[in-house]
Amino acid sequence: MGNKLHIVSLGCTKNLVDTEVMMGKLQNFELTDNQSDADVIIVNTCGFIDAAKQESINTVLNLHDARKEDSVLVMAGCLSERYKEELAKDMPEVDIFTGVGDYDKIDELLVEKKSRFSEAVYLIDGAERVVTGSTYHAYIKLSEGCNQTCSFCAIPSFKGKLNSRTLDSIAKEVESLVKKGYWDFSFVSQDSSSYLRDKNVKDGLSLLIQRVELIEGVKSARILYLYPSTTSMALLKNIAKSEIFHNYFDMPIQHINDDMLRIMKRGFGKKQTLELLEFMKSLPNSFIRTSFIVGHPGESQEMFDEMCKFASSFGFERINVFAYSDEETTPAHEMSDKIAAKVINKRASILGKIAADVMQASLKKEIGKETLLVIDKESDEHEYLLSARKILWAPDIDGEIYVNDRSGEEELNFGAIYNAEITDMVGNILTATTKNASR
């Protein structure tokens, strides 16, 4: 076998961490962007909803069509885990199948050229990763699995119950990455606010915040995927007190109608959800991102209208919109009052337009303000523009800022933090003038 590797990571940032673990085990390979040159092709798949499943299958088949004759094609991750028997039967194009339990054994699988599905979900603990996409930012996994029983979600069926990493394991990984120059961290999991609850520790995230704040060299951090019913006011106050963790609140609430929240088995009603959101909004320099699902079985037009009104009026910074996907093994799959696909798509389009307007309004409020931003790279738009983001924002998902001017003579460096003024907006991209380097 040759030593050229082409690897594709689909789905969420949690998947990306697993992909980086595989890359860490294959550092003797040379990465190539050209699949037809690769000796080994790995696709880390997503099996969350229909669109993601189809993207995963199409990606694998397209790579098979383009690969050279003696290469090895590996299908890994959530889709492989969820449909291991069906895929092994229906996709002879794939040489090796593996699921969510053997990311750290990918080198062994390539030597053996055999498929493998370990029973336990892989939980990162000390494995060396090849962090991609940034020289200063990294995602850190808190846990695997989920103890929630949301009606629409199949993730626990293939990711299992909540299994949290120890504080020591996470701290060691952060410390190791800081030594390599990383200083900005996003903490992720299926349900971040339940971190350590499987170990009978109720305030796990608060303990994590305290621990990370002790690590010299960490300048910036945020927590993604908060779950409403396991997020306490005490946790929000601890985030607000932190000098490292931003007032960044990524909390997918999925709906706002009381009856719909009960049908979805979210464990929290409208009143409790609003109490959390209003408190988040009251905090200085807060940023609230959420997700909604449209077309869940039982969603009436009145319920949908209530969600639209709330989404447009509350003052979110960002909104993700998901069309309901009817997933086998979920309680919603067995419900009788399904919504027609045409209606679901129409509702997704309506709420999607509201989400776009919400983002525009949020961005417009930035014009004229001073902020801290970090410069990522040269812009793809023009050679004289630099691509940046507010240090508060999560990478890739919250937006891009074009730096088109500077007030001083100092050279601007990638991965550095600058004081800047937001000067204008072009489409949905802000422009900024840097003033001077910050911390």
Swiss-Prot record:
Key words of the record: 4Fe-4S, Cytoplasm, Iron, Iron-sulfur, Metal-binding, S-adenosyl-L-methionine, Transferase
Free-text cofactor note: Binds 2 [4Fe-4S] clusters. One cluster is coordinated with 3 cysteines and an exchangeable S-adenosyl-L-methionine.
GO terms assigned for molecular function: 4 iron, 4 sulfur cluster binding; aspartic acid methylthiotransferase activity; metal ion binding; protein methylthiotransferase activity
Claim: Membrane is one of the keywords in the record: no
Swiss-Prot/TrEMBL cofactor(s): [4Fe-4S] cluster
CDD domains the UniProt entry points to: Radical_SAM
Location of this chain's protein in the cell: Cytoplasm
Record EC number: 2.8.4.4
Residues covered by the MTTase N-terminal domain: 3-115
Record Pfam families: Radical_SAM, TRAM_2, UPF0004
InterPro entries: Elp3/MiaA/NifB-like_rSAM, Methylthiotransferase, Methylthiotransferase_CS, Methylthiotransferase_N, Methylthiotransferase_N_sf, NA-bd_OB-fold, Ribosomal_uS12_MeSTrfase_RimO, rSAM
GO cellular component term, pick one: cytosol
Domain of life of the native organism: Bacteria
Domain Radical SAM core residue range list: 132-361
Catalytic activity: L-aspartate(89)-[ribosomal protein uS12]-hydrogen + (sulfur carrier)-SH + AH2 + 2 S-adenosyl-L-methionine = 3-methylsulfanyl-L-aspartate(89)-[ribosomal protein uS12]-hydrogen + (sulfur carrier)-H + 5'-deoxyadenosine + L-methionine + A + S-adenosyl-L-homocysteine + 2 H(+)
Broadest EC class assigned to this enzyme: transferase
GO biological process: tRNA modification
Binding site for [4Fe-4S] cluster 1: C12, C46, C78
Principal place of residence: cytoplasm
Job description of the protein: Catalyzes the methylthiolation of an aspartic acid residue of ribosomal protein uS12.
Family: Belongs to the methylthiotransferase family. RimO subfamily.
PANTHER family: RIBOSOMAL PROTEIN S12 METHYLTHIOTRANSFERASE RIMO, RIBOSOMAL PROTEIN US12 METHYLTHIOTRANSFERASE RIMO
Name by which UniProt lists this protein: Ribosomal protein uS12 methylthiotransferase RimO
Originating organism: Sulfurimonas denitrificans (strain ATCC 33889 / DSM 1251) (Thiomicrospira denitrificans (strain ATCC 33889 / DSM 1251))
Gene that this polypeptide is encoded by: rimO
